[in-house]
Amino acid sequence: KALITMFKNAGFNAIRVPITWYPHMEAKFTTSPWNPETDPIGTQIQAAWMQRVHEVVDYVISKGMYCIINVHHDTGTSNTHWLIADETNYAQEHERFEAVWAQIANEFRDYDEHLLFEGYNEMLDANNSWSYASSENAGKYSSTAASAAYNAINSYAQSFVNAVRATGGNNAQRNLIVNTYAACCGMGTWNSHLQDPLKQMQLPTDNASGHLIFEVHSYPSLNNGLNSAKSSIDQMMAAVEAHLASKGAPVIFGEWGVPDDENENDCTNKNADMQAFVRYFVEQAKTRGFGTFYWMGLSDGNHRTVPEFNQPDLVEAIVKGYYGNDGYTGVTPVSTAPQMANGRLYDLQGRRVTHPRKGLYVSNGRLVSR
């Protein structure tokens, strides 16, 4: 709870909580390493685990922050992933996936708009292809295999929306987040298929108009210098704008930073570039109306138990990238219509608001509440 408070006081107003569910779904673990195909999990989430999730969500929301919860390490490349961007996998697992989300949604059906659901994290095809579907296909790229993977992603996204909406309550209009294939962002020009995950992603059908969000992840490299990283950011964000945001839903970068192999030394050897990089990323995202969630490293490992920021320079750069050179100066109450009418208000994605409802907004570089 102190960790959440630290982030709130620094100027962050939303936290994405990655959650692993499979060990808490009637898992027997009779094989080592565990293989979900031969030792399947059940569908019922353990009450104790759901209570722990509930506890962490309440930590975030009690601070007036927004909270995203998801199905996280049940996807990816490890042997524990039971959700795969594959049509056969979808046929076998979609009912379990829907049951998981029905339980989560029912648990939190009375929570207000401060809680958002993200359907799945980085779902890959059967060959664990990153960057775009079928990139790791044996022999060569297969358009048929890629198409099947994109179809599966869109099917899982639709199942997620359907399962949550069916639970009613505040879930009928809860903001729901769907990720592209592998949460790919279309960054790079080294292959003609890099933007396919953006182009092939569909906006799910939803009875609640305006309550869906797309998510991508981005880890530009600093190995070729700051200017190269900035060019990659510009190219990538233009692609996201053209091929994803244009489909009628806002976009968030649910994870971003630099690749893992650079993290150890970058903050020491490339400190100035790192600060400029993170500030530029946030500034460009805000200009386009994209939300940003930096992945992990600002307070990691043992630093979380203190708690303290192990990369305070990056925290300052990120906050200034959003709020301006004065940084975060706290929340200023806004209580009357004339006050709001005298200054422009923007939501937390940087979009102009002319008829604000109760919530948090940005005015003249300051966070304000109504």
Locations of the language-model features?
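Active-site mouth of glycoside hydrolases
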Residues: 1-191
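C-terminal tail/sorting-segment detector
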Residues: 360-370
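Residue-level detector of functionally pivotal "anchor" positions at catalytic/ligand-binding pockets or at interdomain
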Residues: 327-349
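Acidic carboxylate-rich catalytic motifs and surrounding loops in phosphoryl-/glycosyl-chemistry enzymes
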Residues: 294-300
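Hydrophobic, well-ordered secondary-structure elements that form the walls
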Residues: 292, 350
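Extracellular glycoside hydrolase catalytic/binding regions
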Residues: 99-116, 120-290, 305-320, 324
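Short, exposed beta-strand-loop hairpins at the edges of beta-sheets
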Residues: 301, 307-309, 362-363
